[in-house]
C-alpha cells in the first residue's frame, strides 16, 4: 500500500524530492482504470452464433461477385429492399466486412439503372 502524502513528504529531506513525490502521486491518480470485461452467458453465446450463421448464409445467397472483393448484394433494411454495389475487406478473423466504398440503391433507383444499361453500354463503346 502506498504511503500517504504526509508520511512520504515528512520522511524525505529535500524540497525537490517533495515535488517529485507529488508528481508520482498525481500520475498514479491519473492512470486510467481497466474496463471490466463483460462475461457472456453460455446460452447467449450459442444464440448469437446461431443468428450470425443464419444471417451470413442468407447474405451469401444474395451476394454476386463482380470483381476481386467487389460484390452486388440484395438485402432488406428496415423493410426496404436495397441493392448494394460494394467493396468488401477481410477482418482479422477472416470474416468479410462491407467497406466504405460502395452505393446502396433502392428499388426505384435500381429500375432506372436497368433501363439505362443499353445507353451506358453505348457510351462505353464510344470511348
UniProtKB/Swiss-Prot annotation:
GO terms for cellular component: nucleolus; nucleoplasm; transcription regulator complex. Activity is controlled by protein kinases that target the regulatory region. Phosphorylation inactivates both ds DNA-binding and cofactor function, but does not affect binding to ssDNA. This is Activated RNA polymerase II transcriptional coactivator p15. The gene is Sub1. Belongs to the transcriptional coactivator PC4 family. Residues 7-16, 46-57 have a biased composition (Low complexity). General coactivator that functions cooperatively with TAFs and mediates functional interactions between upstream activators and the general transcriptional machinery. May be involved in stabilizing the multiprotein transcription complex. Binds single-stranded DNA. Also binds, in vitro, non-specifically to double-stranded DNA (ds DNA). Homodimer. Interacts with CSTF2. InterPro entries: PC4_C (IPR003173), ssDNA-bd_transcriptional_reg (IPR009044), Sub1/Tcp4-like (IPR045125). One of its GO terms (biological process) is negative regulation of DNA metabolic process. The modification N6-acetyllysine is found at residues 35, 53, 68. Residues 31-44 have a biased composition (Basic and acidic residues). Residues 1-63 are annotated as: Disordered.
Amino acid at each position: 500500500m502506498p504511503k500517504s502524502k504526509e508520511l512520504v513528504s515528512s520522511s524525505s529531506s529535500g524540497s525537490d524530492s517533495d515535488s517529485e513525490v507529488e508528481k508520482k502521486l498525481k500520475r498514479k491518480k491519473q492512470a486510467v482504470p481497466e474496463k471490466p470485461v463483460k462475461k457472456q452467458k453460455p446460452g447467449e453465446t450459442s444464440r448469437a452464433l446461431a443468428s450470425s450463421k443464419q444471417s451470413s448464409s442468407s447474405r451469401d445467397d444474395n451476394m454476386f461477385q463482380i470483381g476481386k472483393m467487389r460484390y452486388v448484394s440484395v438485402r432488406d433494411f428496415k423493410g426496404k429492399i436495397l441493392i448494394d454495389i460494394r467493396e468488401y475487406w477481410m477482418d482479422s478473423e477472416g470474416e468479410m466486412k462491407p467497406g466504405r466504398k460502395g452505393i446502396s440503391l433502392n428499388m426505384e433507383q435500381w429500375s432506372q439503372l436497368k433501363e439505362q444499361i443499353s445507353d451506358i453500354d453505348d457510351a462505353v463503346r464510344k470511348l
